[in-house]
Amino acid sequence: MRKIQAKKGLSIECKGWEQEAVLRMLYNNLDPEVAERPEDLVVYGGIGKAARNWEAFEAIEKTLRELESDETMLVQSGKPVAVFKTHEEAPRVLISNSVLVPEWANWDHFNELDKKGLIMYGQMTAGSWIYIGSQGIVQGTYETFAELGNQHFNGDLAGTVTLTAGLGGMGGAQPLAITMNHGVAICVDVDETRVDKRIDTKYCDVKTADLDEALKLAEEAKERGEGLSIGLVGNAVDIHQAILEKGFKIDIITDQTSAHDPLNGYVPQGYSVEEAKVLREKDPKKYVELSQASMAKHVELMLEFQKRGAVAFDYGNNIRQVAFNNGVKNAFDFPGFVPAYIRPLFCEGKGPFRFAALSGDPKDIERADEEMRKLFPENEKLLRWLDLAEEKISYQGLPSRIAWLGYGERAKMGLALNRLVRDGEISAPIVIGRDHLDAGSVASPNRETESMKDGSDAVGDWAVLNALINTAAGGSWISFHHGGGVGMGYSLHAGMVVVADGSERAERRLERVLTTDPGMGVARHVDAGYDIAIQTAKEKGIHIPMIDKAGDK
């Protein structure tokens, strides 16, 4: 085991900045400021890892240092398996993580292979080396709660209390996103270290293990109409049940525990973190049974809050499916967050554009933010987000920024960043990527593609096509994964990263990749018959051969 830290500065140890970018982002994923359990190579999301084991990690390191600028390294579930001569505008790395043949695409088979050292769970950005800490999901979470406020609470969350659970790498964004919308958040986590991490990074305001204290703080903040986030240490099922018994009014209920992984991601009711760890190793089968039973109860409690007037939604961890499989037949009575709040953005090719400063200098991000304001002065949502981000976001590892941009905007910003690097206004190359949760890169029937207009929720072709077109367009590293967010058997998804190093070659690649990538999002939603997507494609001149038939669905 080694302690990995994000590498900063202007000197490089690889044969080019592109290879150096891959290495630095791999290191960044495992920086203690960023990763959940770096000693185990776990970045976030239960067992979402950056490399299969330490031996494979060191082989990846060595290969990247030796990789020529016209070669491509292939990575199979966190292990480097080949290097081939390609060309300078091909990706330097192609990654496939935890992809199983459908009949065997379940946790039992995955865990068998994992024990044999043959596979690795890459989550979404863990195994594709573009995780930037909780900031990576904060804006999406912020936009989700903002839209919820628009739909249900006259445009704002002031005077509301949200109850949720899970303060890991993804869920850790919730307290900050809710307070950014002026709401009160009670965020439950059984693991006190996770609450502490969110307090340390200022994503969460206060910590307590006393439910009565949490409710008192929440009520007082609600009456004042002020935002406040409370990290409450405890088991979600116990806490939810107690709040219902006390009759305390909850306005919004959701959940972001790692319920997608019943063995490694969720702690059953009645167990401490340490007790759960012992049982997990001693009797994994019993652990999963207890975990799934707790999830069923968890969803029943969420449904009861909904019955009492709370706005309920699933935050993409597949907890409804587990509950349904364990006897809760009305588990899907509350919607997922994508169809409820996010899909119109996807129809315009909008999604989680993100970039990181390889120099490690926060001034590079400040300059990039300034440029974004100049490029998109009419985008009020973006400007408001940048104000909030600059005020409230603490960097984890390499300085970075998330900014939801749409078709046309991403290419424009990417080219601007490349120009700033070329002209020395930004001191070192910038890495540009995104979450796999994006407009055209995921097939996930219980999350991103839930309730598609044409019923194409489970069609996986789109995620494959996204990876293929971004490879053809010349991304710096491209990934294809299975099971991220919602667990084995429930999702296929692709990621892309492209490096802005100031060169003409980078300019060509940036323009191509940052057009094809969001373009796939528009195309996917055109094909499903969404009017916003059809209008966007026509306005932007995206060539969709059968667009005139799309509206018939």
From Swiss-Prot:
Co-factor(s): NAD(+)
Protein localization: Cytoplasm
Kindly report, in one word, the top-level EC class recorded for this enzyme.
lyase
Entries under Pfam families matching the protein: Urocanase, Urocanase_C, Urocanase_N
Q: Where, by residue number, does NAD(+) bind? A: 45-46, 123, 169-171, 189, 194, 235-236, 256-260, 266-267, 315, 485
* A GO biological-process term: L-histidine catabolic process to glutamate and formate
Write down the superkingdom of origin. Bacteria
**Cofactor note as given:** Binds 1 NAD(+) per subunit.
Tagged with keyword Cytoplasm: yes
Could you tell me which pathway this protein works in? Amino-acid degradation; L-histidine degradation into L-glutamate; N-formimidoyl-L-glutamate from L-histidine: step 2/3
Q: Which molecular-function annotations from GO does this UniProt entry contain?
A: urocanate hydratase activity
Catalytic activity line of the entry: 4-imidazolone-5-propanoate = trans-urocanate + H2O
Q: Which Gene Ontology cellular component terms are annotated? A: cytoplasm
Task: Give the EC number(s) under which this enzyme is classified.
Answer: 4.2.1.49
Q: Which UniProt keywords apply?
A: Cytoplasm, Histidine metabolism, Lyase, NAD
The record describes the protein's role as: Catalyzes the conversion of urocanate to 4-imidazolone-5-propionate.
Which family would the database say this protein is a member of?
Answer: Belongs to the urocanase family.
Tell me what this protein is called. Answer: Urocanate hydratase
- The species this protein belongs to is Staphylococcus aureus (strain N315)
Instruction: Output the lineage of the source organism.
Output: Bacteria, Bacillati, Bacillota, Bacilli, Bacillales
